[in-house]
Amino acid sequence: MDSAISSPEIFIALVVAAHAAILALRLSVSLYRA
C-alpha cells in the first residue's frame, strides 16, 4: 500500500492538526468563559 505521501509527512500533519485543534478548543473555552 504505497501512498503519495510518506509516513513522516503523515505524522507531521497529524501533529500540526492536533496542535491546531487544541488551540481552537482553548480559544473557544476562553471565549465561552468571558
From Swiss-Prot:
Name of the featured protein: Photosystem I reaction center subunit XII
Single GO biological process annotation from the record: photosynthesis
Domain of life: Bacteria
Residue intervals passing through the bilayer: 5-25
Signal sequence coordinates: none
Membrane topology: Single-pass membrane protein
Family: Belongs to the PsaM family.
InterPro entries for the chain: PSI_PsaM, PSI_PsaM_sf
Recorded GO CC terms: photosystem I; plasma membrane-derived thylakoid membrane
UniProt entry keywords in alphabetical sequence: Membrane, Photosynthesis, Photosystem I, Thylakoid, Transmembrane, Transmembrane helix
HAMAP family: PSI_PsaM
Subcellular location: Cellular thylakoid membrane
